[in-house]
Amino acid sequence: MTTTTLEKPAQSRPKSYRFHQGDRVLPFAPAEYDARLAGLRAILRDAGLDAAVLTSMHNIAYYSGFLYCSFGRPYGLVVTQTESVTISAGIDAGQPWRRCHGDNITYTDWERNNYWRAILSVTGAGKAIGYEADHMTLASKGLMDSFLKPASSADIAPATMRQRMMKSAAEIELIRAGAAVADVGGYAIHDAIRPGIREIDVAMAGRDAMELEIAARF
């Protein structure tokens, strides 16, 4: 079933809105993401933090399922003890909601830094914030401090990396399936190699074989 939820803006140029359209399709079951978020929330509790503002592709994908392509715009995932909200640009329309576990807010380009206003709407001001110091630029950190006015902030990137290193049964199953797909591509490349063949034709043989195997498996 497809449902569309597009909040009617209170003004002609809203700072953000929710565009929840279509059926959700995620790489893993909801229980997998719930377990990952439980681990992140434990990290926050142990560090005395109220919320995590994640900005990297790997952490946003790990905790929500959504893998963004920035198109020059910032993306985020805000996690508190009760909420998990992806923050995305309007260029993606309803895709981030369809591809994420949790809520999604779309920010607009009508006013500079609406991205941070959307994050603020989830965290609130004056909270203790965890962020990724190995991904967030100094300029972005300055904007975070300006808009969120955190009581304190701490780098949680090392803790999230340690969590990601511990693979679940579902992750191991997907890794094994991916390796099997790569085997199919490798054999196709081996069979395609012969004197005089172009490199691009060899590469295409491997790609085509893997695409067919992916379609068959997933």
Regions found by a protein language model. Give the residues of each.
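Short, structural beta-strand-to-alpha-helix junction motif
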Residues: 136-138, 198-205, 209, 214
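A composition/biophysics-driven feature that prefers long, compositionally simple stretches
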Residues: 1-185
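Short, contiguous acidic and Ser/Thr-rich linear segments
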Residues: 193-197
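Flexible, glycine/charged-enriched surface loops at secondary-structure junctions
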Residues: 216-218
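Active-site pocket-lining segments that scaffold enzyme catalytic pockets across diverse folds
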Residues: 179-189, 199-201, 207
